[in-house]
Every structure is written in structure tokens, then in C-alpha cells.
UniProtKB/Swiss-Prot annotation:
UniProt keyword Ribonucleoprotein present: yes
Pfam family, one: Ribosomal_S24e
UniProt keyword terms in alphabetical order: Ribonucleoprotein, Ribosomal protein
Protein family per UniProt: Belongs to the eukaryotic ribosomal protein eS24 family.
Gene3D superfamilies hit by this protein: 3.30.70.330
GO biological process, one term: translation
InterPro entries (UniProt xref): Nucleotide-bd_a/b_plait_sf (IPR012677), Ribosomal_eS24 (IPR001976), Ribosomal_eS24_CS (IPR018098), Ribosomal_uL23/eL15/eS24_sf (IPR012678)
Highest taxon listed in the record's lineage: Archaea
A GO MF term: structural constituent of ribosome
Keyword Transport: no
Gene this protein is translated from: rps24e
UniProt protein name: Small ribosomal subunit protein eS24
GO cellular component assignments: ribonucleoprotein complex; ribosome
Length: 102
């Protein structure tokens, strides 16, 4: 899977960068987690700092346009993002599980 950055917009108030990207794939639309990991590797960030919001594939095409938010730290993502988006991206689940056990 090949990921190309279309645009980047800094958002210093929320300690993040908003990114539009395009990915080319051979099979079906890739999962949110695999796109997140590929995007994190391309940007040299930890995968917990990347939140994929949107993936849009046109019928019959092997290109997906997406929107992601890349935070400065994983804590910034936990503070700003809504719970359902964190669950979709599998961020913070281990931290919450540890807190519930204590």
C-alpha cells in the first residue's frame, strides 16, 4: 500500500496537523488500522498519535482518499478526540483497561 500526502495544515491550538492523503491499494479498501500504521511510518510518528477520521473509496477504483489528524503526543489525542473515534483507531484502550482494574 502506497500513501501520498495531498495536503497538511498545522493546528497549533490543538497540538496537531490535519492531513489529507491518498493511498493506492491492490485489494479491497484497507482497514483503518493498516492505513494508520502506514501513515504513521511515513510521517515518522507513533501510531497512537495518528487518528484516521475518514476513508473514501470510489467504486471500482484502487485509490482511497482519507483524512487524518496527527497529534504531537498520544496524550494530546486522548485529550481532544471523541471516545468513539479513539475506539475506532484502537487508541487508549490499554490505558483505560488498566485504570478500571486499579
Amino acid at each position: 500500500m502506497d500513501v501520498d500526502i495531498i495536503s497538511e495544515e498545522e493546528n497549533p491550538m490543538l497540538h496537531r496537523t490535519d492531513i489529507r492523503f491518498e493511498t493506492t491499494h491492490e485489494e479491497a479498501t484497507p482497514s483503518r488500522l493498516s492505513v494508520r500504521d502506514s501513515l504513521a511510518a511515513k510521517l515518522d510518528k507513533a501510531s497512537e498519535e495518528v487518528v484516521v477520521h475518514e476513508l473514501d473509496t470510489k467504486f471500482g477504483m484502487r485509490k482511497t482518499i482519507g483524512y487524518a489528524k496527527v497529534y504531537d503526543t498520544a496524550e494530546d489525542a486522548l485529550d481532544v478526540e471523541q471516545e468513539y473515534m479513539l475506539e475506532r483507531n484502537k487508541i487508549g484502550g490499554e490505558v483505560e483497561a488498566d485504570a478500571e482494574e486499579a
